[in-house]
């Protein structure tokens, strides 16, 4: 079992540096020409946003709340909810976005045979990903749900991460 390095809290300087690094990651890591609304890993409201927010909250509160000393995103989100660090509705949005992005990534791998982090625009590929992921019955339904959920997750991320 790995040991976690726990501080009493996240300093204002550390929080500011974390926000600066996240902004840099967003500016530099998204592949050139990629639509940030469709990139399930690095795009708006995707895996990266949820994980950055969760890990920042762990850094800020794990010194006082032992339940936050976990390595998984979903167990940490559930601990955040249990301890009232975020409203249940916001936790539900973040969890749905993370699960949806994870299912889409797995379905893309099954469909294409390679790792891909971009929600397809081609309707045939969208239909296949919808079926394989179990999310919706049509490509349009999958696309609409993903774009809606990640838009909401990004709103939570921006409010909470930049408000730390």
What are these regions (language model features)?
Residues 1-3, 7-164:
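A nucleotide- and high-energy phosphate-metabolite-utilizing enzyme signature
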């Amino acid at each position: 079992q790995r040991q976690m390095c726990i501080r009493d809290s996240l300093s204002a300087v550390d929080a500011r540096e974390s926000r600066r690094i996240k902004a840099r990651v967003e500016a530099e890591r998204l592949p050139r020409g990629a639509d940030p609304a469709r990139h399930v890993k690095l795009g708006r409201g995707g895996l990266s946003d949820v994980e950055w927010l969760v890990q920042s909250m762990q850094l800020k509160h794990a010194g006082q709340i032992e339940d936050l000393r976990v390595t998984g995103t979903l167990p940490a989100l559930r601990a955040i909810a249990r301890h009232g660090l975020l409203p249940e509705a916001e936790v539900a949005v973040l969890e749905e976005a993370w699960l949806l992005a994870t299912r889409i990534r797995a379905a893309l791998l099954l469909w294409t045979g390679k790792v891909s982090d971009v929600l397809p625009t081609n309707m045939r590929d969208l239909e296949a990903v919808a079926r394989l992921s179990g999310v919706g019955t049509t490509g349009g339904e999958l696309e609409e749900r993903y774009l809606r959920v990640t838009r909401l997750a990004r709103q939570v991320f921006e409010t909470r991460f930049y408000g730390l």
